[in-house]
Amino acid sequence: ELGRTDVLADWKALEKQYSSNILKAIEASVQSDGYVPTGLYDFKTGKQTSSGLDEYRTNCDWENMLLAYPTELFQPKHTYVQSTLKHIRKNYAEGIMTYRHGEFLHQYITANLIEQYMVAGDSRQALIDFYHLILHAGSTHEGFENMIFPWKDRLVDPRCPSPHAWAAAKTAFLIRNFMLHEYGGHIENASERDLYIYPVVSPAWATVGEHLAMVNAPSEFGWITSRLDFTKNGATLTYSPLYNEYQPRSVRFRIPYFKELKSFKTDASESHVEDNCIVLSPDFTTLQIQWKEVKQVHKGTFAELLKAYRSCDSFGGPDEKGYPRMIPGKAFLLEDEDASLVEPLNFDLVKKAFVKEFNRRTSNKK
């Protein structure tokens, strides 16, 4: 609008050089398992830092997993992205991320991982982590930062009290992204940027007679009004955008992980299926979907939640040099824990699994 194309060119050149430097640094720093560490090249940790803290209190995972979203440095299923997520998950506790190598829970930073799963199309894992994120919110949905010990009393340290403003912002934006988000084109290239609508749908939401909706939701492309109604054998999606000067390259609806697409009808001038998404030209207004339930994906959900808790490593305190001493986790099930049960993922199921595991761990300490 200002007509300063000279300034725009300068900023684009700077961004291109900066991205190139970051990619070179990642290639030089990535570990043998594909994990992208918390710093690039050689960086100081522990006593070498200005804070002089012990090693276990530094070098903490924070935003080093933001490799696919929103940065778009790598494709969501790139080895570095997936390996970094896998590496960080080993330090999870209570289904969320931790800080200081497992010493404390860290609620809201979990949203960073959820968004990587979201753009990778792994909506099941995104939902599991999301349900744990809100499980660790207060009665008015307030979030917290850290300073809460895993699998203990859940008392918040008064030096780090809730509610936490950034936790609220991250959670709100995450829920927004579950309804719609922009992706592609490395942010700047509008001609390669897509709009995803309802990209993460829970089995608990997709029941006959229920619906998801948004009214004048702000996006990079303007204001989006839409409604997704669930029917007996499918869904009906209506779409009424008020685009600005930009339109998305396409509008994409991801088929929920627990459904198998049978057919669809739309008034879009162009449409096709790609990467388990119905890809629609931005002129569409209606989409009718026929699908069927994939019941097998619901088998053993409760047992998987329990095994996930138990497979994570735990913080055993610092060693004699101040490094974190990690106690390896191991996935297992007790005799009364049936892995053959068919139970769709929902918040209540996650809460049930968490309470069971919490009681098991705390009762062993008495």
Report residues per predicted region.
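Low-complexity, Ser/Thr/Pro/Gly-enriched N-terminal "stalk/linker" regions
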Residues: N21-P37, Y41
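Inter-helical turn/loop segments and adjacent helix faces that build the functional surface
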Residues: L2-A13
